[in-house]
């Protein structure tokens, strides 16, 4: 069931028994799990994966869907994870060395 004036880009996949409200917009390659409800005026960014119900009047992106500001911040951090991991390991070694000095 898809509400009126809802638009979807290419390659949107919607599993069975999902109800989608009116005035929604879905970017390309959005995937929606079955047996859930998506409220009116929900905007989903491209390649979002929706595992559960979404209340209306929201703009979301990602898997699981989140507010755009949080999504883009997490993507920026994700790119730096290898360096952050290396720094964390170095800090752990330094802490252990300092503990052993006591």
Feature locations, PLM:
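Structural signal for interior beta-strand "rungs" in well-ordered beta-sheet cores
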Residues: 1-67
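Long, leucine- and charge-enriched amphipathic alpha-helices
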Residues: 66-102
């Amino acid at each position: 069931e898809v509400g009126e004036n809802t638009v979807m880009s290419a390659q949107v996949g919607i599993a069975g028994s999902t109800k989608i409200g009116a005035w929604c917009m879905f970017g390309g390659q959005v995937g929606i799990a079955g047996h859930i409800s998506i409220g009116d005026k929900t905007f989903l960014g491209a390649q979002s994966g929706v595992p559960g119900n979404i209340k209306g009047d929201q703009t979301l992106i990602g898997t699981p869907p989140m507010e755009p500001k949080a999504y883009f911040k997490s993507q920026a951090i994700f790119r730096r994870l290898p360096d952050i991991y290396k720094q964390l390991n170095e800090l752990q070694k330094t802490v252990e060395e300092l503990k052993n000095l006591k």
